A protein has these predicted regions:
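Charged docking surfaces used in two-component/phosphorelay signaling
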Residues: 17-25
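His-Asp phosphorelay/catalytic-motif detector in bacterial-type signaling
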Residues: 47-49, 74-79
Length: 133
């Protein structure tokens, strides 16, 4: 697998560690942030291939982070996975406006995260072939 870059943003050290290790072990390059402001700065500087962000973080929520990224040409197309214990509190309109690709409710397994990452980063042809199978 080519080394795709993933930014993982979560203020819970345990979740940040577990998700990062699972992704690194799968061959991804991982950068991490512990709050929304740091995640925004890293997204602008690093242009990751995918963002995994917690919904509830200090300084800026994951939803606000995604919304702000969509307003910048350089980051508007980065797919985003939202991690949340409050998945049902996010309004569908907010998710659509922030262009959140997927939501994973806590608790989740690292395998679920890796599966969703692979789905979102799969080449378009691979996705079409998988849907036809």
């Amino acid at each position: 697998m080519s080394s795709k870059k993933i930014l993982v943003a979560d203020d819970e050290a345990h979740i940040l560690h577990v998700v990062s290790m699972k992704l690194r072990n799968a061959g991804f390059e991982v950068i991490t942030a512990v709050d929304g402001e740091e995640a925004l700065e890293l997204c602008m500087a690093e242009k990751p291939d995918l963002l995994i962000t917690d919904f509830q973080m200090p300084l800026m929520t994951g939803l606000e982070l995604c919304t702000r990224l969509r307003g910048q040409e350089a980051t508007r197309d980065i797919p985003a996975i939202m991690l949340t214990a409050r998945g049902f509190d996010i309004e569908p309109e907010e998710m659509e406006a922030a262009r959140i690709s997927a939501v994973l409710a806590k608790p989740f397994s690292p395998r679920e995260v890796l599966q969703k990452v692979n789905e979102l980063l799969a080449p378009a042809g691979a996705k079409a072939g998988a849907e036809q199978a």
